Protein backbone atom coordinates (compact mmCIF):
# COMPACT_ATOMS: atom_id res chain seq x y z
CA UNK A 1 0.00 0.00 0.00
CA UNK A 2 2.88 2.35 0.88
CA UNK A 3 4.56 1.67 -2.47
CA UNK A 4 1.28 2.30 -4.28
CA UNK A 5 0.78 5.64 -2.55
CA UNK A 6 4.34 6.71 -3.31
CA UNK A 7 3.93 5.70 -6.94
CA UNK A 8 0.80 7.84 -7.17
CA UNK A 9 2.68 10.82 -5.72
CA UNK A 10 5.49 10.37 -8.24
CA UNK A 11 2.99 10.22 -11.11
CA UNK A 12 1.33 13.41 -9.89
CA UNK A 13 4.72 15.11 -9.53
CA UNK A 14 5.72 14.19 -13.07
CA UNK A 15 2.37 15.46 -14.30
CA UNK A 16 2.96 18.79 -12.57
CA UNK A 17 6.37 19.09 -14.23
CA UNK A 18 4.83 18.28 -17.61
CA UNK A 19 2.08 20.87 -17.13
CA UNK A 20 4.68 23.64 -16.97
CA UNK A 21 4.13 23.85 -20.76
CA UNK A 22 5.34 27.13 -22.23
CA UNK A 23 6.68 28.22 -18.88
CA UNK A 24 9.29 25.76 -17.59
CA UNK A 25 11.10 26.66 -14.38
CA UNK A 26 14.46 26.05 -16.07
CA UNK A 27 14.90 27.57 -19.53
CA UNK A 28 17.55 27.22 -22.21
CA UNK A 29 19.28 30.00 -24.17
CA UNK A 30 17.28 28.94 -27.25
CA UNK A 31 14.00 29.31 -25.33
CA UNK A 32 14.96 32.79 -24.16
CA UNK A 33 16.28 33.91 -27.56
CA UNK A 34 12.88 33.20 -29.12
CA UNK A 35 11.22 35.49 -26.57
CA UNK A 36 13.69 38.39 -26.24
CA UNK A 37 11.39 40.85 -28.02
CA UNK A 38 8.27 40.05 -26.02
CA UNK A 39 6.85 42.99 -24.11
CA UNK A 40 5.70 40.76 -21.24
CA UNK A 41 9.24 39.45 -20.60
CA UNK A 42 11.48 40.74 -17.82
CA UNK A 43 15.06 39.47 -17.53
CA UNK A 44 16.90 40.05 -14.26
CA UNK A 45 20.70 39.82 -14.01
CA UNK A 46 21.99 38.97 -10.52
CA UNK A 47 25.71 39.09 -11.25
CA UNK A 48 28.01 41.72 -9.72
CA UNK A 49 27.23 45.29 -10.76
CA UNK A 50 30.68 45.65 -12.37
CA UNK A 51 30.17 42.53 -14.47
CA UNK A 52 26.70 43.73 -15.50
CA UNK A 53 28.17 47.05 -16.65
CA UNK A 54 30.69 45.19 -18.83
CA UNK A 55 27.89 43.36 -20.60
CA UNK A 56 24.56 41.60 -20.17
CA UNK A 57 21.69 40.03 -22.07
CA UNK A 58 19.76 42.72 -23.99
CA UNK A 59 16.91 44.10 -21.91
CA UNK A 60 18.19 42.61 -18.66
CA UNK A 61 17.86 44.70 -15.52
CA UNK A 62 20.46 44.40 -12.78
CA UNK A 63 19.48 43.59 -9.22
CA UNK A 64 21.84 43.51 -6.28
CA UNK A 65 21.11 40.40 -4.24
CA UNK A 66 21.10 42.50 -1.06
CA UNK A 67 17.99 44.30 -2.32
CA UNK A 68 16.04 41.04 -2.08
CA UNK A 69 17.78 39.56 0.96
CA UNK A 70 16.91 41.34 4.18
CA UNK A 71 18.99 41.05 7.34
CA UNK A 72 16.90 39.78 10.26
CA UNK A 73 19.76 39.81 12.80
CA UNK A 74 23.52 39.40 12.74
CA UNK A 75 24.31 36.76 10.14
CA UNK A 76 20.64 35.81 9.72
CA UNK A 77 18.64 36.81 6.65
CA UNK A 78 14.97 36.76 5.74
CA UNK A 79 12.79 37.08 2.68
CA UNK A 80 11.12 40.40 1.88
CA UNK A 81 7.71 40.93 3.42
CA UNK A 82 4.72 41.04 1.08
CA UNK A 83 4.88 44.84 1.02
CA UNK A 84 8.65 44.89 0.46
CA UNK A 85 8.16 42.34 -2.28
CA UNK A 86 5.49 44.41 -4.03
CA UNK A 87 7.79 47.44 -3.99
CA UNK A 88 10.62 45.36 -5.42
CA UNK A 89 8.44 44.06 -8.24
CA UNK A 90 7.18 47.56 -9.04
CA UNK A 91 10.77 48.80 -9.22
CA UNK A 92 11.62 46.05 -11.70
CA UNK A 93 8.51 46.72 -13.77
CA UNK A 94 7.11 43.28 -12.97
CA UNK A 95 3.37 42.62 -12.84
CA UNK A 96 1.52 39.38 -12.25
CA UNK A 97 1.38 38.84 -16.02
CA UNK A 98 5.12 39.30 -16.55
CA UNK A 99 7.27 36.32 -17.48
CA UNK A 100 10.43 36.64 -15.37
CA UNK A 101 13.75 35.03 -16.30
CA UNK A 102 16.64 35.15 -13.83
CA UNK A 103 20.32 34.53 -14.45
CA UNK A 104 23.77 34.98 -12.93
CA UNK A 105 27.31 33.72 -13.44
CA UNK A 106 27.37 31.44 -10.38
CA UNK A 107 25.52 28.34 -11.54
CA UNK A 108 22.17 29.84 -10.59
CA UNK A 109 23.15 30.43 -6.96
CA UNK A 110 22.04 34.07 -6.83
CA UNK A 111 19.18 33.55 -9.26
CA UNK A 112 17.81 30.81 -7.02
CA UNK A 113 17.45 33.24 -4.12
CA UNK A 114 15.32 35.60 -6.19
CA UNK A 115 13.38 32.60 -7.50
CA UNK A 116 12.63 31.69 -3.88
CA UNK A 117 11.55 35.25 -3.13
CA UNK A 118 9.20 35.45 -6.11
CA UNK A 119 7.90 31.92 -5.60
CA UNK A 120 7.00 32.62 -1.98
CA UNK A 121 5.44 35.93 -3.00
CA UNK A 122 3.23 33.91 -5.34
CA UNK A 123 4.43 35.08 -8.75
CA UNK A 124 3.25 32.45 -11.24
CA UNK A 125 5.87 32.75 -14.01
CA UNK A 126 9.49 32.72 -12.87
CA UNK A 127 12.33 30.80 -14.54
CA UNK A 128 16.10 30.44 -14.25
CA UNK A 129 18.35 30.47 -17.32
CA UNK A 130 20.26 27.18 -17.34
CA UNK A 131 24.00 27.81 -17.44
CA UNK A 132 23.58 31.53 -16.86
CA UNK A 133 25.62 34.13 -18.70
CA UNK A 134 28.47 31.70 -19.46
CA UNK A 135 26.31 29.32 -21.47
CA UNK A 136 24.45 32.21 -23.08
CA UNK A 137 27.67 33.78 -24.36
CA UNK A 138 29.25 30.45 -25.30
CA UNK A 139 26.28 29.81 -27.58
CA UNK A 140 26.61 33.18 -29.29
CA UNK A 141 23.74 34.86 -27.46
CA UNK A 142 23.29 38.61 -27.94
CA UNK A 143 25.32 40.72 -25.49
CA UNK A 144 25.22 44.45 -24.82
CA UNK A 145 26.36 47.21 -22.49
CA UNK A 146 23.26 49.29 -23.24
CA UNK A 147 21.14 49.97 -20.18
CA UNK A 148 17.44 49.16 -20.65
CA UNK A 149 14.80 51.79 -20.06
CA UNK A 150 12.22 49.97 -18.02
CA UNK A 151 9.56 52.12 -16.34
CA UNK A 152 8.43 51.25 -12.87
CA UNK A 153 5.16 49.39 -12.85
CA UNK A 154 2.30 51.71 -11.99
CA UNK A 155 0.24 48.72 -10.99
CA UNK A 156 1.26 47.19 -7.68
CA UNK A 157 1.16 43.43 -8.32
CA UNK A 158 -1.57 41.56 -6.49
CA UNK A 159 -0.06 38.22 -5.56
CA UNK A 160 -0.88 35.44 -3.13
CA UNK A 161 2.12 34.93 -0.82
CA UNK A 162 2.80 31.28 0.03
CA UNK A 163 3.44 31.71 3.76
CA UNK A 164 3.53 27.94 4.28
CA UNK A 165 6.70 27.77 2.17
CA UNK A 166 8.80 29.47 4.87
CA UNK A 167 9.42 28.20 8.41
CA UNK A 168 11.10 29.29 11.61
CA UNK A 169 13.21 27.34 14.10
CA UNK A 170 10.28 26.39 16.34
CA UNK A 171 8.33 24.97 13.40
CA UNK A 172 11.32 22.84 12.40
CA UNK A 173 12.07 21.70 15.97
CA UNK A 174 8.47 20.59 16.50
CA UNK A 175 8.67 18.30 13.45
CA UNK A 176 12.05 16.63 13.97
CA UNK A 177 10.50 13.26 14.84
CA UNK A 178 7.98 13.20 12.02
CA UNK A 179 8.59 10.60 9.32
CA UNK A 180 6.73 12.66 6.75
CA UNK A 181 9.26 15.50 7.02
CA UNK A 182 12.75 15.45 5.49
CA UNK A 183 15.50 17.99 6.12
CA UNK A 184 18.15 18.76 3.49
CA UNK A 185 21.40 20.50 4.47
CA UNK A 186 22.89 22.20 1.40
CA UNK A 187 26.25 23.04 3.02
CA UNK A 188 29.59 21.34 2.51
CA UNK A 189 30.35 18.03 4.23
CA UNK A 190 32.81 19.74 6.60
CA UNK A 191 30.14 22.22 7.70
CA UNK A 192 27.60 19.43 8.07
CA UNK A 193 29.93 17.41 10.33
CA UNK A 194 31.06 20.43 12.34
CA UNK A 195 34.67 20.47 11.12
CA UNK A 196 34.08 23.82 9.43
CA UNK A 197 32.69 25.90 12.27
CA UNK A 198 30.66 28.96 11.27
CA UNK A 199 28.52 29.39 14.40
CA UNK A 200 28.98 28.86 18.13
CA UNK A 201 28.19 25.19 17.59
CA UNK A 202 29.07 22.88 14.74
CA UNK A 203 27.07 20.05 13.24
CA UNK A 204 23.64 19.79 11.68
CA UNK A 205 19.95 19.64 12.52
CA UNK A 206 19.04 16.14 13.77
CA UNK A 207 17.92 13.87 10.95
CA UNK A 208 19.07 16.17 8.15
CA UNK A 209 20.78 14.63 5.13
CA UNK A 210 23.67 16.39 3.43
CA UNK A 211 23.26 17.14 -0.28
CA UNK A 212 25.60 20.00 -1.07
CA UNK A 213 24.10 22.43 -3.58
CA UNK A 214 27.08 22.09 -5.94
CA UNK A 215 26.04 18.50 -6.64
CA UNK A 216 23.13 19.85 -8.70
CA UNK A 217 25.50 21.13 -11.37
CA UNK A 218 27.53 19.67 -14.19
CA UNK A 219 31.10 20.76 -14.91
CA UNK A 220 29.91 23.47 -17.33
CA UNK A 221 27.63 25.06 -14.72
CA UNK A 222 24.37 23.73 -16.16
CA UNK A 223 21.96 21.65 -14.13
CA UNK A 224 22.25 17.87 -14.20
CA UNK A 225 19.47 15.95 -15.97
CA UNK A 226 16.23 15.77 -14.00
CA UNK A 227 16.42 11.98 -13.72
CA UNK A 228 19.85 12.24 -12.10
CA UNK A 229 18.71 14.96 -9.70
CA UNK A 230 15.62 12.96 -8.79
CA UNK A 231 17.71 9.87 -8.05
CA UNK A 232 20.12 11.94 -5.96
CA UNK A 233 17.33 12.99 -3.60
CA UNK A 234 15.41 9.75 -3.53
CA UNK A 235 18.62 7.87 -2.66
CA UNK A 236 18.63 9.91 0.57
CA UNK A 237 14.92 9.16 1.15
CA UNK A 238 13.96 12.70 0.26
CA UNK A 239 10.82 11.76 -1.61
CA UNK A 240 7.90 13.79 -3.02
CA UNK A 241 5.44 12.41 -0.47
CA UNK A 242 7.26 14.29 2.32
CA UNK A 243 7.44 17.91 3.36
CA UNK A 244 11.04 18.85 2.57
CA UNK A 245 12.79 21.52 4.64
CA UNK A 246 15.83 23.22 3.12
CA UNK A 247 18.63 25.02 4.96
CA UNK A 248 22.34 25.87 4.84
CA UNK A 249 24.23 28.61 6.72
CA UNK A 250 22.07 31.57 5.65
CA UNK A 251 19.72 29.85 3.17
CA UNK A 252 21.57 31.36 0.22
CA UNK A 253 22.87 27.99 -0.97
CA UNK A 254 19.71 26.26 0.21
CA UNK A 255 17.70 28.44 -2.18
CA UNK A 256 19.40 26.42 -4.92
CA UNK A 257 18.07 23.27 -3.26
CA UNK A 258 14.61 24.81 -2.96
CA UNK A 259 14.67 25.56 -6.69
CA UNK A 260 15.79 22.06 -7.65
CA UNK A 261 13.05 20.46 -5.56
CA UNK A 262 10.48 22.76 -7.16
CA UNK A 263 11.97 21.88 -10.54
CA UNK A 264 11.47 18.20 -9.73
CA UNK A 265 7.85 18.90 -8.84
CA UNK A 266 8.03 18.29 -5.09
CA UNK A 267 4.71 19.67 -3.82
CA UNK A 268 5.75 20.70 -0.29
CA UNK A 269 9.11 22.47 -0.02
CA UNK A 270 9.73 24.69 3.00
CA UNK A 271 12.62 27.14 3.39
CA UNK A 272 14.08 27.45 6.88
CA UNK A 273 15.62 30.86 6.23
CA UNK A 274 17.23 31.19 9.67
CA UNK A 275 19.33 28.13 8.80
CA UNK A 276 22.52 27.27 10.70
CA UNK A 277 23.30 30.93 11.41
CA UNK A 278 20.32 30.77 13.77
CA UNK A 279 20.20 27.09 14.77
CA UNK A 280 23.93 26.78 15.42
CA UNK A 281 23.93 29.81 17.69
CA UNK A 282 21.01 28.73 19.87
CA UNK A 283 21.92 26.46 22.77
CA UNK A 284 18.27 25.44 23.25
CA UNK A 285 18.09 23.65 19.88
CA UNK A 286 19.32 20.05 19.38
CA UNK A 287 22.07 19.10 16.96
CA UNK A 288 23.99 16.13 15.59
CA UNK A 289 27.57 15.79 14.36
PLM features: what roles do these ranges have?
Residues 23-49, 59-62:
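Mature N-terminal segment immediately following signal peptide/propeptide cleavage
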Residues 70-99, 213-244:
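Helix-loop module immediately N-terminal to the HCX5R catalytic loop
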